[in-house]
Amino acid sequence: MVLLPAFLDGLARTVSTKKGKKLSEDEDGGREIAKSMIKDSKKNSTLLGTSGFVSSESSKRFTSICSNRGEKGINQDRAIVWEGFGCQEDITFCGMFDGHGPWGHVIAKRVKKSFPSSLLCQWQQTLASLSSSPECSSPFDLWKQACLKTFSIIDLDLKISPSIDSYCSGCTALTAVLQGDHLVIANAGDSRAVIATTSDDGNGLVPVQLSVDFKPNIPEEAERIKQSDGRLFCLDDEPGVYRVGMPNGGSLGLAVSRAFGDYCLKDFGLVSEPEVTYRKITDKDQFLILATDGMWDVMTNNEAVEIVRGVKERRKSAKRLVERAVTLWRRKRRSIAMDDISVLCLFFRPS
């Protein structure tokens, strides 16, 4: 166990509000407080939910976002970055949500809207439970517990919502919380997080993948699906793309093994539980890339890092990745309808 009095004292500043209310006193009240924080952040230009960029004078971080609609109809990708998350100057929250199915765009939009406030509530409740003890868990344990609870709550919220049909629709989720030099990644789906770090010889950058692309044919995922009587199969026109389906579901299936929604498959191995990982950011680490599978389907980790490295204006970094991915898609997969492509680039320090 690690003693963290200073760390917890810093987080505790988010407990009190102008009205003197505490997040831990009432979960509904906590959500209202979080929503109020979101409104204030939008006014102060520290929260971005569309293509563009946001910078933080206090943390010296810079984030760029870009999204491109594919050839399948409505853009079902949603992204968000929130500098000063929870009124903490040194915390940045990033989220990438990729919808699928008839209601995928609606679900991704709802998750993007509700996830930050829910995470704030769970973060505060976890903090309150830990701060009552003289010995507290590490920063990673704190965020991991909050993330696991949030993913569960978001999935249940979709299930009981009378206004959204998430039986055969859903969305993946990839989130990042950066507090000081603590980076926590939570992933349920096939979007990917890649960090660019200085090579050992100091002459370049190398990519380090921080998340797993949760496809149904990954051994651990496939075993869970089989144990749940789910079916693994590929469509005739996509022989290398494995899907999870119902035992007698015909061609109905999903090409990821973890996601929000899709309740027709939740009894057959699909789960919404994320994998939560940690990295201590050092001076060698330069930037983080979060992107939906539309980009990674046609671009390697190394290619992505090199493209961002070569961009002179950081605000154009995400856009440059999207443009390159579109070009590669048309060259490599011209017989397949282009997927939505969304990218977020987070730079850790000033240029």
Swiss-Prot record:
Domain PPM-type phosphatase: 62-348
Ranges in a coiled coil: none
Binding site for Mn(2+) 1: 98-99
Keywords of the record: Hydrolase, Magnesium, Manganese, Metal-binding, Protein phosphatase
Pfam families cross-referenced by the UniProt entry: PP2C
EC number per UniProt: 3.1.3.16
A cellular component annotation (GO) from this entry: cytoplasm
Amino-acid positions noted as binding Mn(2+) 2 in the UniProt annotation, renumbered to this chain: 98, 293, 339
Textual note on the cofactor: Binds 2 magnesium or manganese ions per subunit.
Metal-binding recorded as keyword: yes
Main EC class the enzyme belongs to: hydrolase
Cofactors required: Mg(2+); Mn(2+)
A molecular function GO annotation: metal ion binding
GO annotation, biological process: drought recovery; microtubule cytoskeleton organization; negative regulation of growth; protein dephosphorylation
Protein's UniProt keywords contain Zinc: no
Catalysed reactions, as listed in the record: O-phospho-L-seryl-[protein] + H2O = L-seryl-[protein] + phosphate; O-phospho-L-threonyl-[protein] + H2O = L-threonyl-[protein] + phosphate
Family according to the record: Belongs to the PP2C family.
Name this polypeptide is given: Probable protein phosphatase 2C 41
